[in-house]
Amino acid sequence: MAKVVGIDLGTTNSCVAVMEGGKPTVIANAEGFRTTPSVVAFAKNQDRLVGQIAKRQAVMNPENTFYSVKRFIGRRPDEVTNELTEVAYKVDTSGNAVKLDSSNAGKQFAPEEISAQVLRKLAEDASKYLGETVTQAVITVPAYFNDSQRQATKDAGKIAGLEVLRIINEPTAAALAYGLDKKSNERILVFDLGGGTFDVSVLEVGDGVFEVLATSGDTHLGGDDFDKKIVDFLAGEFQKNEGIDLRKDKQALQRLTEAAEKAKIELSSATQTEINLPFITATQDGPKHLDLTLTRAKFEELASDLIDRCRIPVEQAIKDAKLALSEIDEIVLVGGSTRIPAVQAIVKQMTGKEPNQSVNPDEVVAIGAAIQGGVLAGEVKDILLLDVTPLSLGVETLGGVMTKLIPRNTTIPTKKSETFSTAADGQTNVEIHVLQGEREMASDNKSLGTFRLDGIPPAPRGVPQIEVIFDIDANGILNVTAKDKGSGKEQSISITGASTLSDNEVDRMVKDAEANAAADKERRERIDLKNQADTLVYQSEKQLSELGDKISADEKSKVEGFIQELKDALAAEDYDKIKSIIEQLQQALYAAGSSVYQQASAEASANAQAGPSSSSSSSSGDDDVIDAEFSESK
């Protein structure tokens, strides 16, 4: 079988590896480096440059040099507002999709197209190394990437001419590389702080089994954000001294960005660094130069809020894994940004353990992807990888409630189904609104897409049985199917190009869910109460109609009175009154029902007949039907 390579498609740098002789090997690129900058540029002659050569010319060609593209992939225009100010190239958000504008190429590119150029270079370099054409790959993504971002990454692979056999999470890949030869069971925490994203995963590793217990993250926290802190500091100091904002000059901004990255790297080993940028700009008085000293202490002060943000996903992952930090055996650092001393210090402070630095943080993810590639190719035996989905998935039901089908941190691949019904008599279609998030209300979660199931035979509400099936594959990509059990009509949607989560929304969902738990619970209880009251009104009117003259006029009048009171309370949204009248109406119905049975029993005795004379017909479906309904799509 052909070789399957493992690719870490990073925000700042990318890496490719392959299994050779049962061991993973990192493949150096054509320039001799083991990592490749995730940078693509278009020169004036329209030549396409990829990797180190593209990065080197960025200062002279800032508007046609594309970097940190991973922050745009799989996202909608309204979700990249913050990113627009952090790059020197033009990002077009006027249409339905994000486009990257290149004046030299004379066209616009989708982020997937730019990422595909990086993937293509890695595949070509691997092909030269192996002496055979590479056509299959395992590509890694941040654990907190959503469905659209995962699919967009897969599409980038396809554009690059690769068959993407699997999309796997970066911290999981790192755990594979770390734990390949581990025989004894260990609980490990992977702390993955890369160029653009931050992931934390808790895994149980040992004897070939890699089980993810929980994952958390922040999709807008990485090395780029640390660089921006330095850029803003340098630009602020220069503006204070010279009255000029360098951030408005794209060429100067590119020079500042490169200087900031270099300073950040130097401060990992030195306590201070000199930043010299001669001829950074010019005025009528002549050229201006930037010359500053940046200490590690000042850098840590500038980035203190970013470092503090590292705490939340760690705490969330530990909580979701139902473990204490003392139960974690090893802390594995992944991603170049974990070289920052302050980051290592906060990890040690939180966990009370020295982080394990036995793996190369720049290469370990690609190595893990190569191991997974070896598993899929049959080269690596006796490895079982059990990953999870990072966010809950569900559908919107009556009252705007999110009904969860798959809770977050569920092992994938997985398939779950639930049966729902209609909300109105004669309803012939339902709209399935697929959601992702942790809040109780649909409007507070992220919409992944909607689709409609038509052709439901007209029937009283609550009678049709509509089975909704959620199927997440090993790539973490979701497919949803809705099927009417009566007619056999079926409709499905693959959540691929749907609306996706913005950079702040994913982690905000979990935080908001906890912060707003009480309010969410109250709103959910109110909607449940309204649904209960609606159903009771419907059933009561139906029962009165069926009983006819079997109950006395007084009993009938009493029930009708409570029904009207309940309708009035519903209209006024008086929840205390709704609760009170529900109880009174139920008691009145019980009394009416009892009198019917007593009357029937008396008649039976008079006729000397034994046995029941009536039977209950209250069952309306099988036990799997959830007490939640769809509103009819107009």
Curated annotation (Swiss-Prot):
CDD domains: ASKHA_NBD_HSP70_DnaK-like. InterPro entries: ATPase_NBD, Chaperone_DnaK, Heat_shock_70_CS, HSP70_C_sf, HSP70_peptide-bd_sf, Hsp_70_fam. SUPFAM superfamilies: Actin-like ATPase domain, Heat shock protein 70kD (HSP70), C-terminal subdomain, Heat shock protein 70kD (HSP70), peptide-binding domain. Residues 601-620 have a biased composition (Low complexity). Residues 601-634 are annotated as: Disordered. One of its GO terms (molecular function) is unfolded protein binding. Keywords: ATP-binding, Chaperone, Nucleotide-binding, Phosphoprotein, Stress response. NCBIfam families: PRK00290.1, PRK05183.1, prok_dnaK. This is Chaperone protein dnaK2. It comes from Synechococcus elongatus (strain ATCC 33912 / PCC 7942 / FACHB-805). The lineage of its organism: Bacteria, Bacillati, Cyanobacteriota, Cyanophyceae, Synechococcales.
